[in-house]
């Protein structure tokens, strides 16, 4: 039996997509949450000096989207054909661009940096959020299935639904302009295995 181990900090963050794919697949895995104080000792042993990591029977893979793509292919949620897979990857890459664009806001909001949160919300987060959720809305509309690509769940649905859930928890009014993503989040998180994971995973602030 294949042994999967996901190593990340004790938060959701970039490690959550791997956990959710494995949970969706009903696959047992080792959820290795590394405390901040232990990270300096672990860091030199990682391929790129960062987390998350996926270990598959001892073989190590780094980078969250590489991990997500590998697991999605293993468990059949990477699109039903080569074109769908490419579309899924394009949305995933754009989602990463979105997170990079709004990163200054979230770094201050989460207490990892100092800055004017109100100004960052107005000048960085809201423009980035509206722009990129507008892009993603076009994919939802084009698919016409309630999913972002094709007619079944893919790993980008997990990515976007988790982020939407986090935004709703922080400020439900944020999604008033994009009600289709409230419906999308509810659809994705109604999956029995995902629902079980969300109910039983460790409670973390982000």
Curated annotation (Swiss-Prot):
GO terms for biological process: glutathione metabolic process; innate immune response. Residues 2-79 form the GST N-terminal domain. It catalyses: RX + glutathione = an S-substituted glutathione + a halide anion + H(+). Its EC number is 2.5.1.18. Keywords: Transferase. Glutathione binds at residues 8, 39, 43, 49-51, 63-64. PROSITE patterns: GST_CTER, GST_NTER. It is an enzyme of class 2 (transferase). PANTHER family: GLUTATHIONE S-TRANSFERASE, GLUTATHIONE S-TRANSFERASE 7-RELATED. This is Probable glutathione S-transferase 7.
């Amino acid at each position: 039996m294949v042994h999967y181990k996901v190593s990340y900090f004790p938060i959701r963050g970039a490690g959550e997509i791997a956990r959710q794919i494995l949970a969706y697949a009903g696959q047992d895995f080792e959820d290795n949450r590394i405390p901040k104080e232990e990270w300096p000792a672990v860091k030199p042993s990682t391929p790129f000096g960062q987390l998350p990591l996926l270990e598959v029977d001892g073989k190590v893979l780094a980078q969250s989207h590489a991990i997500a793509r590998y697991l999605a292919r293993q468990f059949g949620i990477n699109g039903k054909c080569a074109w769908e897979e490419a579309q899924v990857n394009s949305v995933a890459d754009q989602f990463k661009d979105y997170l990079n664009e709004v990163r200054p806001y979230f770094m201050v909001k989460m207490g990892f940096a100092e800055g004017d949160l109100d100004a960052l919300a107005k000048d960085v987060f809201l423009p980035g959020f509206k722009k990129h959720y507008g892009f993603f809305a076009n994919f939802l509309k084009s698919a016409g299935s309630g999913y972002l690509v094709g007619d079944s769940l893919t790993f980008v649905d997990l990515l976007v639904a988790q982020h939407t859930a986090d935004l709703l928890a922080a400020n439900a009014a944020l999604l008033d302009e994009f009600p289709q993503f409230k419906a999308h989040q509810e659809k994705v998180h109604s999956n029995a295995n995902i629902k079980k994971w969300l109910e039983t995973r460790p409670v973390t602030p982000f």
